[in-house]
Design a protein with these regions (language model features):
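Short, ordered loop/turn segments at secondary-structure junctions
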Residues: 24, 43-44, 68-71, 89
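C-terminal structural segments of small proteins and small subunits
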Residues: 70-105
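Small/polar loops that bind or transfer phosphate-bearing groups
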Residues: 40-41, 64, 83-87
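N-terminal first-folded block
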Residues: 1-40
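Mid-chain, well-packed structural core segment of small domains
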Residues: 50-81
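N-terminal positively charged helical leader segments and presequences
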Residues: 30-53, 60-62
């Protein structure tokens, strides 16, 4: 995973208005089928991870884990964020591509 690129792309998506911030907004975005990708902080509670993971599995949305709540929020211009949903399809695809790639390839 190329974390810096993923974080920059999340920031771009946020500036473009293509991100739903926070646990509740991310869940609602997944439930309403607007989300193309969901992101959860590594230090989110087990309950949050399970609830968002279950929603993503049910609605067919990919879920990734990225950094802690301060890293996740910081890359999107917030103090912190436990969860977020990317609604822009093109940026979600590129974020996922960078997340799955390995350094040096």
């Amino acid at each position: 995973m190329q974390r810096d690129k993923v974080q920059r792309l999340l920031g771009l998506a946020a500036r473009a208005g293509g991100v739903a911030y926070g646990e509740g907004a991310a869940e609602e975005s997944v439930r309403s089928k607007r989300a193309r990708l969901a992101v959860v902080a590594a230090d989110a509670s087990d309950n949050t991870k399970k609830r968002l993971g279950d929603k993503c599995a049910f609605y067919g949305v990919r879920l990734i884990e990225l950094g802690d709540r301060y890293e996740l929020g910081g890359c999107m211009g917030k103090d912190f964020a436990v969860a977020a949903a990317v609604t822009n399809a093109g940026l979600a695809k590129e974020i996922l591509k960078q997340y799955e790639s390995r350094d040096g390839e």
